[in-house]
Regions:
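Conserved small/polar residues in nucleotide/adenosyl-binding loops
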Residues: 1-4, 161-167
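Active-site recognition of the HExxH zinc-binding catalytic motif
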Residues: 7-16
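Conserved catalytic/binding loops enriched for acidic/polar residues
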Residues: 23-25, 29-165
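Acidic, metal/ion-coordinating pockets
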Residues: 20
Length: 167
């Protein structure tokens, strides 16, 4: 997590905005593939607020967090810092329509009522199929919640709100 956080904050230092379409880079199946996630990362941008990539299938576990800048980050830095003539700048801008360069910032995300208008711009999601991923998260919570209650419940407590911290 620390590496992802540092990458995100360095991105801000370099002038990058949040990119809440970054989590749409990989498919649901690709996020479970260790080799794919190590090669491409999880998101097209470290400026995303992605969900932690926990798999329901431990044998099919990709990276939990991004560990490398994504293709959008490389493209945005190239655009911001390349010292090129007008033709070179046009060549960089021509790449803006690539799917891995999709962009949406805080003004576009749908965190709250009446805020944003792009359903692909969301925080704490992951994959190009966020509905399937959300269903997977519900299954994950339903699978681990009973174990958490049993493992960390204070004696006599009846609610998850009375869990003890692991020692």
């Amino acid at each position: 997590y620390k590496r992802q956080l540092v990458l995100h904050e360095v991105g801000h230092t370099l002038g990058l905005n949040h990119n809440f379409k970054g989590s749409n880079l990989l498919t649901y199946e690709e996020i479970k593939n260790k080799e794919t996630t190590y090669e491409k990362g999880l998101c097209s941008s470290v400026m995303e607020y992605p969900s932690i990539n926990f798999s329901l299938e431990p044998e099919n576990q990709g990276l939990y967090y991004d560990t490398i800048p994504g293709p959008y980050d490389h493209w945005a830095i190239r655009f911001a810092y390349s010292q090129v003539d007008e033709k070179g700048l046009k060549a960089i801008l021509d790449d803006s329509t690539k799917p891995e360069h999709a962009f949406a910032n805080d003004a576009d995300d749908m965190r709250g009522t009446g805020k944003g208008m792009d359903p692909d711009a969301m925080i704490y999601d992951l994959t190009s199929d966020p509905v399937l991923y959300a269903i997977d998260r519900i299954k994950l919570v339903n699978e681990i919640l009973p174990e958490l209650l049993e493992k960390y419940r204070k004696p006599g407590a009846v609610s998850y709100t009375h869990l003890t911290l692991p020692t």
